[in-house]
C-alpha cells in the first residue's frame, strides 16, 4: 500500500476534522507537513527583489534591482521575482499573493501552531509594500518591471543583473481590469491576514484595494493590450471579467460591504461557459489567468446559493470522477495532469480549493470525502508518493530536484545555464513543474523550463494546502532551519603565473576573479597588490613597472611595506568585475617589474606558489592580495596575516561593462552534421506550443547557429524562448541567444515557441547555418 493509501485507510473510519483542528487530533501523516510548509514558505524569501530586510533568511541572497522605477521617476523596488528569471510580472505576483493570503485567512491557527505565521506575514508585507509603491495614484498601476526578452537572454544571479529594467503601467488611457482587479484581491485578502496584528496596515491595504477595484471597474480593458511585453509571458487569455468577480469577492470578505457582493454576483453572469452551452467552464482550473474557479468556491461558501454550489461541484467532479464522460487526465501513478507546463501547479491549485470547499461542504458526505481525498492524493504525489518515489519539492523528502531552472540558485558566473554543472544553492521549498504528460516521467534538467522551472504561482496554493494538511495530520517544522550555506570555494580570488622572466625582470600574468554567490556581488573598486623584496642594496628608484596586456587601470609603485619589502598596485577601479558573464567575472593584467640592479624573485613574497615556467597556466596565488576599497577579499600579506574576506553588504548594480579588446579567438567552422527534433507540446483552439531540439552529430563544435525551416500550414510564431525568431510567410529563421550559442560535438540545445494556427506537422526539412540538416 502506498503512503497515501495508508493515510486514506486511516481517515476512512474517522469523522473528518475541520481545518482548524489541532494537529494532535489528526491521523498519522504520510509526510512531515510541518517541514514542507516551512520550506514552501521560505521559497518566497528567496524570490525577494530590492532591499532585503535585516532578518533576511536566505544566506545567498543580497540586495538587487535597486534602480527599479528610476526610469519613470518612482521607487519600484521590492516585490517578488516571478520564477527562475528576474522580471517582476504584476499579474502572477498578485495572484500568488492572493492565494497565499487565502491560505493564511483559512489556516491561521495552522500557521501559528507551526511557527510560520510571522514568516507568512513578513512575505505578504514585503509583496504588498511593493504593490503600494506600484500604485502611486488611484488610476495608475505599474504592472511589470523588466523586459522579458532582455531578462531571459542573460543567465546569472539577481544581484548583478547588467540589463536595464524598464517599468510598464496601466492607467485610465490604457487600462487593465484584470491586473487592477487581481491586485485589489491581493491587497484585500492580505488585509485580512493583518486585521488583528496590524489594523493600521490592514486599513492601508484596503484603501488601495478599493481604489484599484474602482479603477478596474470604471476603465475596462485587458492589461496585456497595454503592457504588451507581457503578451509573450503572461497574456490575459481569459480576459478581465473573472478578476472583476474575484476582486469584488475578496473586498466583500474583507469589508462586509454588500455592494461588493452585488458587483461580484452581477459580473459572475458574464463568466466564461463551455463551448455552445450556458454551463460555466469547468475543464480548466484556478490559475493566474483565470480565477473563475476560485470564485465558484468562495461564492458558494459566502452565499450558499445553489448555482455556485453546482458550478463548484461540476468543476471538482471533472477533476475527480468526471462530467459528461470526460475528466482530467490521470497518470498511472495518480497525478491529475491538466497541461504540460507546470502540471503540478495546476494539481496543487485545485487541491487547495478542493480542501477549502470540502471543509465547508455539508449535506453531501460523498463529495466532501471525494474532494478531500483527491486533494490529499495530489499534494502527497508532489511530496513523494509517486512511482518515482521522489519529491518534486527542492530540498524536501526523497530524491528531490537539485537542478531547478532558476538563475540565482544556480549561481553561474559565466552567463551559462550549463556552468557550473550543479546548482550552488538549495532553493528549499520550490515546487517544480513536474511531469509534462500523464506518464509520471520526469528528468531533473535545468534546461527544461517546462518541467523544472519554479515560480511564485506554483507555490502559492501549494503552501495553503500544506497548512491545511498540517492542521489535520500534524508534522514538525525543523528547529534548525534555515542554516547558512557555506561557499563552495573561494568566491573572489587571484590566479597568477610567470608570463616571462629574465636576469633583471619578472612579468606576471594575473587574473582577478569574481565567482561570488553568497551573495553575488560586484567589485567596482578592486585593486591588486604584488609584494617583492629589493635585493643587493637596490633602491626603489631603480624599479620600474610596465604592462603588456591590461584590462584594469594604472600600475603604480613600488610602495614601501616594511624593511626591504615593497609592493606594486594594479588599480582595477575602472572596471566592474562581477559574476555576470565570461568577460565580466574575470579581468586580466600582465605586468612587468624591472630592476636596473640586482633581481632575484625567489625570495619575493607574492612569487611563492606561482608557476614559474613562462606561459604556465595561472593558479590560485594566495600571496597576491586583492582588495575592494579598504576591504581585503583575497590573499595574505607578508606578515603572514590572511584577512577574512568582507562581502559587500549592498551589492552595487552592475552596468554593462565595456570590455577591453582581447585577442579574437580563431573561429571554428560550424558542423554540417546535425539532427533536429520538432515536437508540438500543447494545442488549443487557435494556438499551440512546440519544442525544437538541435543536436550536433559532427566532430567540431558549432559556434553560433541559425536554424531554418518552413511551416507546412498557416502557423505563425508569436513568441519564443531560448532563441530569437523571425518569420516571412511560412519561412522561419531561428538564431541562438548568448547562453546556447555553442553546441559541442555530441551535444544538443533546444528552444521553444508559441504560435497561432493549427499545427500541420513537423517541417519537412531543416537547415543549420544555411546547410541541410537531418
Go through the PLM ranges and name each one:
Residues 534-574, 716-736, 751:
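A surface/secretory-pathway sequence property marking extracellular, secreted
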Residues 577-642, 750-774:
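Terminal connector regions
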Residues 518-529, 536-545, 700-708, 717-721:
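Short, hydrophobic/aromatic beta-strand segments
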Residues 474-505, 669-686:
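Low-complexity, acidic Ser/Thr/Pro/Gly-rich terminal tails and inter-domain linkers that flank the onset
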Residues 1-24:
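Secretory targeting and sorting signals
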Residues 496-497, 502-525, 529-533, 685-701:
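Short beta-strand elements of extracellular/lumenal beta-sandwich folds
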Residues 29-42, 46-103, 144-182, 186, ...:
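Aromatic (Trp/Tyr) and acidic
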Residues 639-671:
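Ser/Thr/Gly/Pro-rich low-complexity, disordered linker/stalk segments of secreted
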Amino acid at each position: 500500500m502506498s503512503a497515501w493509501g495508508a493515510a486514506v485507510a486511516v481517515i476512512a473510519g474517522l469523522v473528518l476534522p475541520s481545518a482548524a483542528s489541532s494537529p494532535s487530533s489528526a491521523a498519522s501523516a504520510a509526510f512531515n507537513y510541518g517541514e514542507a510548509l516551512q520550506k514552501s514558505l521560505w521559497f518566497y524569501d528567496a524570490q525577494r527583489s530590492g532591499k532585503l530586510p535585516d532578518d533576511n533568511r536566505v544566506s545567498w541572497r543580497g540586495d538587487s534591482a535597486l534602480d527599479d522605477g528610476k526610469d519613470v521617476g518612482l521607487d519600484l523596488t521590492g516585490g517578488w521575482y516571478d520564477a527562475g528569471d528576474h522580471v517582476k510580472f504584476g499579474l502572477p505576483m498578485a495572484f500568488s499573493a492572493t492565494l497565499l493570503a487565502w491560505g493564511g485567512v483559512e489556516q491561521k491557527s495552522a500557521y501559528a501552531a507551526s511557527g510560520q505565521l510571522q514568516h507568512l506575514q513578513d512575505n505578504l508585507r514585503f509583496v504588498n509594500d511593493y504593490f503600494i509603491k506600484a500604485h502611486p495614484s488611484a488610476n495608475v498601476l505599474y504592472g511589470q518591471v523588466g523586459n522579458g526578452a532582455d531578462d531571459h537572454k542573460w543567465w546569472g544571479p539577481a544581484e548583478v543583473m547588467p540589463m536595464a529594467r524598464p517599468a510598464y503601467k496601466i492607467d485610465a488611457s490604457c487600462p487593465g481590469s484584470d491586473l487592477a482587479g487581481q491586485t485589489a484581491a491581493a491587497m484585500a485578502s492580505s488585509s485580512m491576514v493583518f486585521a488583528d496584528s496590524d489594523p493600521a496596515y490592514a486599513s492601508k491595504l484596503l484603501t488601495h484595494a478599493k481604489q484599484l477595484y474602482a479603477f478596474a471597474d470604471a476603465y475596462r480593458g485587458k492589461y496585456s493590450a497595454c503592457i504588451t511585453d507581457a503578451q509573450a509571458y503572461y497574456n490575459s487569455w481569459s480576459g478581465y471579467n473573472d478578476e472583476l468577480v474575484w476582486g469584488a469577492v475578496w473586498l466583500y470578505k474583507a469589508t462586509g460591504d454588500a455592494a461588493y457582493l452585488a458587483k461580484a454576483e452581477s459580473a459572475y453572469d458574464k463568466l466564461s461557459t463551455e463551448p455552445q452551452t450556458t454551463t460555466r467552464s469547468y475543464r480548466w482550473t484556478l490559475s493566474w489567468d483565470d480565477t473563475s474557479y476560485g470564485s465558484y468556491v468562495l461564492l458558494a461558501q459566502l452565499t450558499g446559493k445553489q448555482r455556485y454550489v453546482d458550478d463548484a461541484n461540476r468543476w471538482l467532479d471533472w477533476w475527480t470522477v468526471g462530467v459528461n464522460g470526460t475528466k482530467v487526465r490521470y497518470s498511472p501513478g495518480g497525478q491529475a495532469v491538466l497541461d504540460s507546463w507546470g502540471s503540478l501547479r495546476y494539481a496543487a491549485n485545485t487541491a487547495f480549493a478542493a480542501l477549502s470547499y470540502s471543509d465547508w461542504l455539508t449535506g453531501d458526505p460523498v463529495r466532501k470525502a471525494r474532494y478531500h481525498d483527491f486533494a490529499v492524493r495530489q499534494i502527497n504525489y508532489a511530496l513523494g508518493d509517486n512511482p518515482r518515489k521522489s519529491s518534486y519539492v527542492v530540498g524536501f523528502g526523497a530524491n528531490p530536484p537539485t537542478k531547478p531552472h532558476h538563475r540565482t540558485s544556480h549561481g553561474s558566473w559565466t552567463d551559462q545555464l550549463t556552468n557550473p554543472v550543479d546548482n550552488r544553492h538549495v532553493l528549499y521549498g520550490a515546487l517544480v513543474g513536474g511531469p509534462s504528460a500523464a506518464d509520471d516521467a520526469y528528468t531533473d534538467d535545468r534546461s527544461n523550463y517546462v518541467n523544472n522551472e519554479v515560480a511564485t504561482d506554483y507555490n502559492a496554493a501549494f503552501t495553503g494546502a500544506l497548512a491545511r494538511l498540517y492542521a489535520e495530520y500534524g508534522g514538525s517544522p525543523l528547529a534548525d532551519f534555515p542554516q547558512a550555506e557555506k561557499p563552495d570555494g573561494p568566491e573572489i580570488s587571484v590566479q597568477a603565473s610567470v608570463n616571462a622572466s629574465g636576469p633583471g625582470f619578472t612579468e606576471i600574468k594575473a587574473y582577478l576573479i569574481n565567482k561570488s554567490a553568497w551573495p553575488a556581488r560586484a567589485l567596482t573598486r578592486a585593486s591588486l597588490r604584488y609584494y617583492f623584496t629589493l635585493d643587493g642594496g637596490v633602491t626603489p628608484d631603480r624599479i620600474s613597472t610596465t604592462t603588456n596586456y591590461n584590462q584594469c587601470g594604472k600600475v603604480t609603485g613600488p610602495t614601501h611595506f616594511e624593511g626591504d619589502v615593497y609592493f606594486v598596485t594594479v588599480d582595477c577601479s575602472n572596471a566592474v568585475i562581477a559574476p555576470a558573464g565570461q568577460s565580466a567575472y574575470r579581468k586580466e593584467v600582465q605586468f612587468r617589474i624591472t630592476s636596473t640592479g640586482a633581481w632575484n624573485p625567489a625570495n619575493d613574497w607574492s612569487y611563492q606558489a606561482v608557476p614559474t615556467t613562462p606561459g604556465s597556466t595561472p593558479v590560485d596565488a594566495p600571496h597576491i592580495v586583492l582588495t575592494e576599497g579598504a576591504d581585503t577579499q583575497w590573499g595574505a600579506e607578508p606578515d603572514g596575516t590572511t584577512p577574512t574576506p568582507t562581502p559587500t553588504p549592498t551589492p552595487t548594480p552592475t552596468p554593462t561593462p565595456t570590455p577591453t579588446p582581447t585577442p579574437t579567438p580563431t573561429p571554428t567552422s560550424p558542423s554540417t552534421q546535425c539532427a533536429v527534433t520538432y515536437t508540438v507540446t500543447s494545442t488549443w483552439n487557435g494556438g499551440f506550443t512546440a519544442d525544437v531540439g538541435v543536436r550536433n552529430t559532427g566532430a567540431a563544435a558549432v559556434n553560433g547557429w541559425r536554424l531554418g525551416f518552413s511551416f507546412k500550414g498557416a502557423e505563425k510564431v508569436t513568441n519564443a524562448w531560448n532563441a530569437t525568431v523571425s518569420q516571412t510567410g511560412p519561412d522561419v529563421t531561428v538564431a541562438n541567444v548568448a547562453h546556447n550559442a555553442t553546441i559541442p560535438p555530441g551535444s544538443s540545445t533546444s528552444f521553444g515557441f508559441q504560435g497561432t494556427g493549427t499545427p500541420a506537422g513537423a517541417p519537412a526539412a531543416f537547415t543549420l547555418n544555411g546547410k541541410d540538416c537531418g
